[in-house]
């Protein structure tokens, strides 16, 4: 039934329209999520809307630029938002300065929505025929290759959904402190899983079966790990300082 639906949409010339529509819906869902999530980080409705209007257009533009550079300045194709996840915190810092909010809170506030975009956006990739897996006899029909392929896009959706749930749990556990830890762990969890999932994609490999997007994912893991090391060291130093400022009776020195 699913294969028949994909084939029918392709034959009617609807594939790209449906894909673009779902991508836009994903953006709207992200915005709605952030509007409801804003109170956790002490943001007003207007601040939330302004933050979204600063961060997402800037991230999209950066995505186009990075794709253009990777394509040898030839075209703007092969766009994928994964390219900008490492750099999004820098855009968040700018948004935080504009809104006079904590940079750490702004960064952690945005983190779950990054993974949420993957949940929705990838769900419709099979209709467009992009991000496809390798040929598979029991797979879904791909309108580009006109063969059945492994439905890795939906596997990526499931993994991204698990990451969203994990980030929300982590943020709550941290009492929405806005230390940057949530985004750092987003980079690690999403980057590591995406690196592995890239091996299921039937795309161009650069070296040892590793694709360009897999390298971006690996870079995410490296940056996220370094980020967590810095945060853990800061927490360690704070704990040491707190012990120094407390006398043996447990009272804070004045």
Protein language model features and the residues they cover:
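Hydrophobic, membrane-interfacing alpha helices
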Residues: 1-254
């Amino acid at each position: 039934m699913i294969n028949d639906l994909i084939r029918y949409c392709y034959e009617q010339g609807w594939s790209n329209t449906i894909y673009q529509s779902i991508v836009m819906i994903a953006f709207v869902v992200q915005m709605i999520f952030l509007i409801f999530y804003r109170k956790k980080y002490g943001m007003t409705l207007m601040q939330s809307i302004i933050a979204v209007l600063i961060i997402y257009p800037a991230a999209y533009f950066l995505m186009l630029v990075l794709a253009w550079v990777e394509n040898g300045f030839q075209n703007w194709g092969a766009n994928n938002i994964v390219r900008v996840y490492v750099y999004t915190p820098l855009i968040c810092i700018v948004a935080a300065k504009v809104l006079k909010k904590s940079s750490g809170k702004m960064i952690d506030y945005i983190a779950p929505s990054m993974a949420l975009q993957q949940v929705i956006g990838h769900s419709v990739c099979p209709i467009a025929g992009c991000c496809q897996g390798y040929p598979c006899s029991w797979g879904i029909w791909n309108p580009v290759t006109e063969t059945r392929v492994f439905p890795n896009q939906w596997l990526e959706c499931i993994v991204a959904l698990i990451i969203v749930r994990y980030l929300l749990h982590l943020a709550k556990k941290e009492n929405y402190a806005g230390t940057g830890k949530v985004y750092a762990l987003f980079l690690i969890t999403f980057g590591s899983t995406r690196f592995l999932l890239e091996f299921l994609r039937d795309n161009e490999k650069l070296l040892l079966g590793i694709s360009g997007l897999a390298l971006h994912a690996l870079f995410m893991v490296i940056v996220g790990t370094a980020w967590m090391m810095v945060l853990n060291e800061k927490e360690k130093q704070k704990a040491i300082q707190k012990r120094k400022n407390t006398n043996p009776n447990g009272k804070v020195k004045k």
